[in-house]
Each structure stands twice: as C-alpha cells, then as structure tokens.
Amino acid sequence: MQVVNVATLPGIVRASYAMPDVHWGYGFPIGGVAATDVDNDGVVSPGGVGFDISCGVRLLVGEGLDREELQPRLPAVMDRLDRAIPRGVGTAGVWRLPDRNTLQEVLTGGARFAVEQGHGVALDLERCEDGGVMTGADAAKISDRALQRGLGQIGSLGSGNHFLEVQAVDRVYDPVAAAPMGLAEGTVCVMIHTGSRGLGHQICTDHVRQMEQAMGRYGIAVPDRQLACVPVHSPDGQAYLAAMAAAANYGRANRQLLTEATRRVFADATGTPLDLLYDVSHNLAKIETHPIDGQLRSVCVHRKGATRSLPPHHHELPAELAAVGQPVLIPGTMGTASYVLAGVTGNPAFFSTAHGAGRVLSRHQAARHTSGEAIRASLAKRGIIVRGTSRRDIAEEKPEAYKDVDEVIEASHQSGLARKVARLVPLGCVKG
C-alpha cells in the first residue's frame, strides 16, 4: 500500500519503485524510490528520505592485510575498536566541537571540512559521493533543538542497526571490477554504517510538521499524512532541502571521523593502512537530471533505504572506477554476508538499488524470544566477535530479524539494478 500511495504524489514520473529489500516505513516504504519533476509541480517529501538523513555506508580496504594474517590479532583489534568507537543513544562522539560555529562548518563542509581539519586525506574525498559535501546546505534552516542534538554527537555510531564491522572478502564474482576496488579473496575490509544521528532525526521531525501545515496552501492532499510534501521550488521545499543537505554533510563527516578512529586502531594493532573504497548514502533526496519521455528533465529523486548505483563512465565517478561503475555497498546482518556491487547501464529505477537485507521482524518481535547473550555466544561459535552496548540491542538485530541478504542481492543482480562484484563475511562487529 505504501508503494501505491507514493505513486499519487504530485509530479511523480515513471513509477513508484520498490527495491528487493522493501519493507514498511514512515510514509515511503524503506526500500522505496520515487522521482518528481521539479519544473512540473514536483514535490519533495521528508518521508521519502526518512528520519536518519544520509544514513549510509562506507567500506575501508586493508592494504595487503589478509584474513589469515589478521585472525590471531582479531580479538585485540575488536577490543580496541570497542573502546575507540562511541555508540548508543545520545552518546557523545570522538570530536568535541568547541561551539556552534564549528558545527556550522561541519554542516556546510561535510567530510571535506573533516579532512581539512586533519581527519583524513584528500584521496578520501575522491571516493565519497559528491566529493564528501552536498551543496546547498543552510544551517539557518535548522532548529535550535536540532543543532543542540548535533553539537555533541559527531563521530559516533548511534544505535539500532548501525554498526562497524570487520569483514573479509569471501568470494569475488567479477575480477575485472574487483581489481581497481582492491578486493581479492581473503582481503580484510571494514564497513561503517551510520548517519546524521539526532540532528537528522530532529530536522525530519521539524519539517514534517511544517509541511503538514503548509500543504493546504499549495492545494496538496495526500492519502497518508506521513507523505506530507510541498513543491520543490516552494520556500518550504527549499528550506527542507537546505536543512537536509546540512544533515547529509553531518552524516558524511560523521563517517569520516569514525574512519580515522578505525584507521588508528588498525595502524597500532596491525600496522596496516585502510584505504577508502567508497562512501554512499541510502537516505537522501537529490536533484538529478534523467531522460523522461525522450527529454532530459530535472527531477527530485527520493531514495529511502535505497542506494544510488551509477553506471560505468558516469561523470560523477572517480577516474580509477569509471570503467567498472560506482561501488554499491550493501550490508547484511551481524551473522550474514555483505556485498559490494557495481552500477550498471540501463537501471530503470533512476540508478538505484537495495540498501540492505530488509527487516521482517520488528525490534520488539526480534528481542521477544531471544537474549543478546545467546546471540553473541552463537556468533562466537562461528568465529564472529560481537561488541555491543546492550544485550537488547544485539537481540533486536539478530540475523533472523532480516530477509535473506543473498536473495536480495541476487534479485538486484538479476533485475538489472546492479551487478555482483564481491561477497564479504563478518569477522567482528561493533554494534550501535
């Protein structure tokens, strides 16, 4: 029903799309994609982005570090990561911002500002969506409450399904694409999944309320109040997009800071540098140009729980990846595989694909009959080390709470949304 409701939004073009990992969400389904024609009454809807604005994934690749080489040191590495990575609801981050002026630099500069402050290298930005910074951000469109929530959380995982996972490449499907990505069987990687924390949540909350009140002024009626929306070109629409871009930059800076904390752990424990393969959001609305009915049109592409998947030779790709397409990072669960895919030509859903396994059990249902300690012990028997803030958090994220990620990936591959490059298996997980 949510996919159908999205199809009624003013200005929608082509279709309302559901990705293979689709499940129920706020307004839009999680795993939903829709584009609206911004010059023909197209709207923007915060429900099409979600509360965790710019929640996304980045993958770090261990330069010359093999799974067998890491194995004896893995417990020590996980203990160090456990201490180095802040997480949990309301947790303070690794970077203590001195004042709101510095926060505003983060909101407008994203990962680029973090790198300029010494938290990374210039090459990192070449491997980030939009070069690590989304233009159009305006902190003046953000409430004091949202700013206050963002001030102390930069550089932290948060809670829920967010994580930092040490992985190893288990299988390579496409050696030609895997080579420039630095992926070979046995290669150690680190996947980071988090977003814009309390700041993004508050921005969504604030602008949903504003749009609920504003829709009448624009003559808009929606079948579900959670689909509150306004025209992209309206003052309300521009205010949301400016605030959303600021949250996107916060999320990108957040992952950049966690990257540096992780690099320090690996440098100290293994002497191995970690190179950034790619960083991409899966909760975002972006103004893009796409062919619609034979003409190039400016559209607002909502991707909620959906990963951008650019094809080979797209102008936004770094030169060394242009021939193979954008790396698409799709995490599984604590006990299952994650995947690296690549974008393909002809993707019908505005170059979008899945973002994860997709929930089948609510958090309450997942935790009802299982203890976090039992899950931790079960994973330990399989050689997977788990570090979590609470037993309930671990129970809520048990593998059985999600769809079979292998089936989600196969559906993405077979339907022409992306192609398989490599399969990664978990070695250790720091849970948010």
Swiss-Prot record:
Cofactor note: Binds 2 manganese ions per subunit.
Protein's UniProt keywords contain Nucleotide-binding: yes
UniProt subunit comment: Monomer.
Family in the record: Belongs to the RtcB family.
Induction: A member of the dormancy regulon. Induced in response to reduced oxygen tension (hypoxia) and low levels of nitric oxide (NO).
Domain of life: Bacteria
A Pfam family reported for this protein in Swiss-Prot or TrEMBL: RtcB
EC category: ligase
Active-site residues, record numbering mapped to chain: 355 (gmp-histidine intermediate)
Binding-site residues, Mn(2+) 2: 55, 193, 282
Catalytic activity: a 3'-end 3'-phospho-ribonucleotide-RNA + a 5'-end dephospho-ribonucleoside-RNA + GTP = a ribonucleotidyl-ribonucleotide-RNA + GMP + diphosphate; a 3'-end 2',3'-cyclophospho-ribonucleotide-RNA + a 5'-end dephospho-ribonucleoside-RNA + GTP + H2O = a ribonucleotidyl-ribonucleotide-RNA + GMP + diphosphate + H(+)
Keywords: GTP-binding, Ligase, Manganese, Metal-binding, Nucleotide-binding, RNA repair
Cofactor section: Mn(2+)
Its EC number(s): 6.5.1.8
Name this protein carries in UniProt: RNA-splicing ligase RtcB
Additional record remark: Ligation proceeds through 3 nucleotidyl transfer steps, with 2',3'-cyclic phosphate termini being hydrolyzed to 3'-P termini in a step that precedes 3'-P activation with GMP. In the first nucleotidyl transfer step, RtcB reacts with GTP to form a covalent RtcB-histidine-GMP intermediate with release of PPi; in the second step, the GMP moiety is transferred to the RNA 3'-P; in the third step, the 5'-OH from the opposite RNA strand attacks the activated 3'-P to form a 3',5'-phosphodiester bond and release GMP.
GN (gene name): rtcB
Record-linked PANTHER family: RNA-SPLICING LIGASE RTCB HOMOLOG
Binding annotation for Mn(2+) 1: 52, 55, 162
Binding site for GMP: 161-165, 282-283, 331-334, 338, 355-358, 431
Function: GTP-dependent RNA ligase that is involved in RNA repair. Joins RNA with 2',3'-cyclic-phosphate or 3'-phosphate ends to RNA with 5'-hydroxy ends.
SUPFAM superfamilies with a match to the protein in the record: Hypothetical protein PH1602 (SSF103365)
InterPro entries found in the cross-reference section: RtcB (IPR001233), RtcB-like_sf (IPR036025)
Gene Ontology molecular-function annotations: GTP binding; metal ion binding; RNA ligase (ATP) activity; RNA ligase (GTP) activity
GO biological process terms held by the UniProt record: RNA processing; RNA repair
